[in-house]
């Protein structure tokens, strides 16, 4: 039941940016451009917060934790460097895994790729928990003159990842459908929709 709650909460966060990015394949250039703009703009805060929202949910398994982003932002303000460091590593560790989606792998070899996906995803989850734990142990936020510049850098990191995430549909054998196989936030598996 915990996994189902996590999936539902994560899908709520990813629905708008993912569907908007998928909508950017429209034949109408105006609609496609608008969808791309909406998808990228909405993806930036989603990608910056979602790993920590998932970590917040994992503390007690209550679905309502997915809808408390202010709690996560408070934790971020108490340990901004830990959150920025872990966000960077979470998104960087996800990048090489996109290359494994270039060509469809025979079904009998999928388990080997799944092990690789889990090996990259597990440290990411641990980093998110570590950063959230550091924020939870501190009483007060870091001084604003230090906190705001650090928090500012989360946006370009997430923006760059959102652009790369969007472009991966051009190298994935699954095309636009690969946007729904977001191994960073959903199942750490290579081809769970079309495999």
State where each predicted segment sits.
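Interfacial aromatic "cap" segments that immediately flank transmembrane helices
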Residues: 1-13, 51-99, 139-157
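Selective recognition of hydrophobic, aromatic-rich stretches within alpha-helical transmembrane segments
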Residues: 26-66, 99-146
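Membrane-embedded alpha-helical bundles that form the substrate/pore pathway
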Residues: 6-10, 40-43, 159-162
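Cytosolic/matrix-facing juxtamembrane and C-terminal tails of multi-pass cellular membrane proteins
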Residues: 133-194
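Long, highly hydrophobic alpha-helical transmembrane signal-anchor segments
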Residues: 1-37
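Alpha-helical transmembrane segments and their membrane-interface junctions
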Residues: 11-25, 86-108, 161-179
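Enriched - but not universal
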Residues: 16, 114, 125, 147-148, ...
């Amino acid at each position: 039941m915990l996994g189902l709650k996590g999936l539902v909460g994560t899908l709520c966060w990813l629905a708008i940016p993912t569907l908007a990015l998928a909508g950017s394949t429209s034949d109408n250039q105006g609609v496609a451009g608008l969808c791309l703009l909406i998808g990228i703009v909405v993806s930036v805060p989603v990608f910056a917060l979602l790993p920590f929202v998932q970590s917040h949910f994992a503390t007690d398994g209550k679905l309502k934790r997915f809808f408390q982003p202010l709690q996560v932002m408070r934790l971020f303000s108490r340990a901004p460097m830990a959150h920025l460091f872990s966000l960077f590593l979470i998104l960087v560790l996800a990048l090489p895994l996109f290359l494994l989606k270039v060509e469809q792998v025979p079904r009998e070899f999928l388990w080997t790729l799944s092990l690789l996906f889990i090996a990259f995803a597990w440290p990411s989850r641990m980093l998110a928990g570590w950063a959230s734990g550091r924020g939870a142990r501190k009483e007060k936020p870091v001084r604003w003159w230090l906190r705001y510049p650090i928090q500012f850098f989360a946006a370009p990191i997430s923006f760059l990842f959102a652009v790369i995430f969007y472009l991966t549909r051009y190298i994935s054998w699954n095309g636009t459908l690969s946007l729904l196989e977001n191994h960073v936030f959903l199942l750490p598996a290579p081809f769970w929709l079309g495999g």
